């Protein structure tokens, strides 16, 4: 059988990509990128930190943020277990909290710092600087923020898309994101500057809501599980969990019900075929394993040649899953060779055509990289 070189197992699995690279190689951009590249570690850690907040340090940062904005410190600081709990509290209590001061404590100082740095670096320099700093953290962090917001709305409003959901959405927009503000804070000097108070809260707490008389602070998550692409992913419990039981469940980035995950350990081919939701059925197949499903289902190959074996899984009310089984020509450290299952279009008719498709080639143009 011909083996195909897909690189080592590490290469195949890939690494997290969380931003864009800077365009161009001008001197200013290169200098800025070199200065920033080694400084993202702490920001990445703060953005994904779990465990109890340092309440004293976070509260000190909040009070300093008010003072830097020219505002009186909040009369009270109230702690809650999660963003969901914060929204619930704001809807049901704290009528005396006063107006939101988010723009004064967060948006205005950020805008001034960005304007100053943009003026100093110029358009190309700023673009390079952002790509080397916050841009590397932005995509995965913002995806997490969006999922939390969606989870809060779904938990509190259910299927409602009207007034109740709109009210919750507005309260979520009042939040300063604390640890999840790490991407844009990473682009600016953090010590003894106008943003140092926001940085302090970022380092020590989760989301927070600044109002004229009251500040509401949320704890950080107690658990966070993501795959190599930075997506929420956990097959055994919540992918994101807060200390008050607010949680998000996901499989490779796809939101799933908690009870669905609980049933994955006892999956059978019959249960997979019986699932009516096509997206959940695909999750089941990924968890169960395509190769195991094929074996347990008594499936037969559609086609076999020197490049691999073509398999087909027919699914009710969904397009079939067609895969090519190939043997990697690059050995593992122990000398063995890993088998890979490559998802290909349902119209694929031969193993060679399937492997060629993964390289963007026609079947007749594909030549295997190595033979054994």
Residue ranges with predicted function:
Residues 1-372:
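Short, glycine-biased loop/turn motifs at secondary-structure junctions and
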